[in-house]
């Protein structure tokens, strides 16, 4: 299966939420997301539009300008997105690094770990389709999972030989979702550094940078701000553990799909339905039950945020 950070994190939080957001059948495909109301500016839509504007900006700085993306039909969203990118350009009129790549989508095959012991040191090649784990006597297929995502900016610090990568995160003014303590513990830095090593080999990969864009206040009385970029390093052991954990999650998702499918309600983590600072996107139907009215008025088919058509699969 193909798995990204968002899907893995949602499954960790609640398998039933993962099913609703990634696998629930719709006429357009798989998965549901909340439907914006009127001119509401959703965090997901604003983040997507901001990524388009940042892609234009960094390609401009790189010297390879691209055709501008169409403006959003949501006037409130477009106004806020333009306000943020204008302030961002003023904050960073130039960068002190060489831009190598912008908005790079990727598909990297995850390691073949035995689904019983999650080790790879005693694998025996049986044929081009399967391995035998001599530790536990278990046969399993090769290449069962692929890690997918998009690296926002790949760059080389001036005078340095290694490549660093940067990820942009847009959040509300008072949010603490991207504070340094959270990023110090997150797996994304480890996983992206692992993927970058495969994508850009034989280049040496250095550090992961978090670039937070804080939205203006709700009534626009305070402008957007951009905290100092966070710089994260990871040890080989941290990277190896994060990759192993992702393989484990992907195996669990496949196991749940086999056991529960579309006919039986998936297990859920009810402790996370209401976290104290917000509710799960599917709190209403999971608490009071699905109805046609809730489905039509509250949800829409999920829009894919990764365009992976034609993106080659890379072996690490």
List where the protein language model places each region.
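Short alpha-helix boundary/capping segments
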Residues: 41-45, 177-187
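Active-site-adjacent bridging/hinge elements
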Residues: 19-29, 162-169, 250-255
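Residue-level detector of short, conserved catalytic/binding motifs and their immediate flanks
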Residues: 151, 190, 278
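Nuclease catalytic cores
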Residues: 2-59, 103-104, 275, 279-285
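Catalytic cores of nuclease domains that cleave nucleic-acid phosphodiester backbones
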Residues: 53-175, 198-207, 316
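Metal-dependent nuclease catalytic regions and adjoining charged, substrate-binding loops involved
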Residues: 116-117, 125-127, 143, 181-182, ...
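Short small-residue beta-strand/loop micro-motif enriched in glycine and branched aliphatics
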Residues: 29-32, 173-177
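Short amphipathic alpha-helical face segments that pack within enzyme cores
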Residues: 49, 187-195
């Amino acid at each position: 299966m193909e798995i990204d950070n968002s899907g893995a994190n949602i499954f960790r939080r609640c398998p039933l939420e993962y099913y609703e957001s990634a696998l629930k059948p719709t006429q357009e495909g798989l998965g549901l997301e909340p439907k914006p109301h009127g001119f509401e500016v959703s965090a997901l839509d604003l983040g997507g539009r901001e990524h388009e504007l940042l892609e234009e900006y960094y390609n401009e700085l790189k010297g390879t300008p691209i055709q501008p993306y169409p403006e959003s039909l949501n006037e409130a969203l477009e106004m806020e997105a333009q306000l943020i990118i204008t302030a961002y350009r003023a904050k960073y009129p130039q960068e002190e690094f060489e831009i190598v790549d912008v908005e790079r989508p990727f598909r990297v095959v995850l390691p073949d770990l035995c689904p019983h012991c999650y080790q790879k040191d005693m694998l025996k090649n049986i044929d081009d389709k399967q391995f035998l784990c001599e530790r536990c006597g278990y046969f399993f297929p090769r290449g069962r999972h692929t890690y997918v995502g998009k690296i926002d900016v790949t760059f080389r610090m001036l005078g340095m030989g290694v490549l660093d990568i940067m990820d942009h995160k847009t959040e509300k003014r008072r949010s603490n979702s991207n504070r340094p303590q959270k990023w110090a513990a997150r797996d994304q830095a480890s996983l992206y550094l692992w993927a970058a090593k495969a994508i850009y080999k034989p280049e040496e990969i250095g550090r992961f940078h978090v670039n937070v864009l804080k939205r203006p206040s709700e009534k626009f009385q305070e402008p957007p701000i951009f905290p100092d970029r966070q710089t994260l390093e990871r040890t080989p052991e941290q990277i190896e553990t994060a990759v192993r954990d992702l393989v484990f999650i992907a195996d669990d998702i496949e196991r749940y799909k086999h056991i529960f499918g579309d006919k039986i309600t998936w297990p859920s983590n009810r402790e996370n339905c209401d976290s104290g600072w917000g509710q799960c996107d599917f709190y209403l139907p999971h608490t009071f039950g699905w109805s046609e009215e809730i489905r039509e008025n509250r949800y829409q088919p999920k829009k894919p945020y990764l365009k992976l058509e034609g993106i080659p699969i890379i072996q690490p």
